[in-house]
């Protein structure tokens, strides 16, 4: 069994050694331009077209939760990957726990009005503020996949009203489910906090725009943990300036790194993190990949395969 590996920033040698240990029967090598030798599996992140084109692969593993970089490249270069080759993504591998930590900490930050107290502190102003009531602090999750489910579970501990919206209806205990475009407005109407965990597909690009933000209650909050392309930044800035959106916590952006001149940096109601909400944990990813390859070799049914038509 031959495995090729490519990631522009990961510690390639660590991964190769870990994979060799986890899959002793495999010959694992770092792919470099010009390497056209045979391979059974490819582990990739933002792969060059030539890495995958023309190969008779058993499967490709994207080294992250999203596969939009591969799918967008396939649109321009359909020859890059045979349609019959299964494409897998890392469904969790520790990312769910990280998303839970990030989402819960920020929701509680807003619920306890720490954002308002920070602004008061900046002007040396001492003034207790009325508390928010839990039963009125509805949390809405856009996107009901593996990570959305994990975030919902973690928020249930705090007894906030929870709702989710997705392409198809879900049956999550304690979570009100909305499905399809026809139910999006009803979903948004009560969301004091909107958490975006949508996949990046042609249908979701620019979905968080003026029209969507206007359907939120006045003074709502936005937490974007998915992709920057989901948000129309000018529309979000306008909503923040008007007070329609009271605050935004943003981990992802249309351009990364976020350019220094981007007005989001200086907005008093915006908090920025550099795409760190949930990073790939190498040891857990290697365990998932090695287990999945073993299942594929046995012809067993596996989880995590991407539906290329849907984009996730």
Swiss-Prot record:
Compartment(s) where it occurs, according to its Swiss-Prot or TrEMBL record: Cytoplasm
Recorded catalytic activity of this chain's protein: glycolate + NADP(+) = glyoxylate + NADPH + H(+); (R)-glycerate + NAD(+) = 3-hydroxypyruvate + NADH + H(+); (R)-glycerate + NADP(+) = 3-hydroxypyruvate + NADPH + H(+)
EC number, as in UniProt: 1.1.1.79, 1.1.1.81
Molecular function via GO: glyoxylate reductase (NADPH) activity; hydroxypyruvate reductase (NADH) activity; hydroxypyruvate reductase (NADPH) activity; NAD binding
InterPro entries: D-isomer_DH_CS, D-isomer_DH_NAD-bd, GhrA_Enterobacterales, NAD(P)-bd_dom_sf
Active site: 227, 275 (proton donor)
GO cellular component term of the entry, any: cytosol
Highest taxon of the lineage: Bacteria
PROSITE patterns for this protein: D_2_HYDROXYACID_DH_3 (PS00671)
Enzyme class: oxidoreductase
Pfam families named in the record: 2-Hacid_dh_C
Keyword Cytoplasm attributed: yes
Hydrolase keyword on record: no
Family designation: Belongs to the D-isomer specific 2-hydroxyacid dehydrogenase family. GhrA subfamily.
Summary of the function given for this chain in its UniProt record: Catalyzes the NADPH-dependent reduction of glyoxylate and hydroxypyruvate into glycolate and glycerate, respectively.
Protein name according to UniProt: Glyoxylate/hydroxypyruvate reductase A
Native organism: Escherichia coli (strain 55989 / EAEC)
Gene giving rise to this polypeptide: ghrA
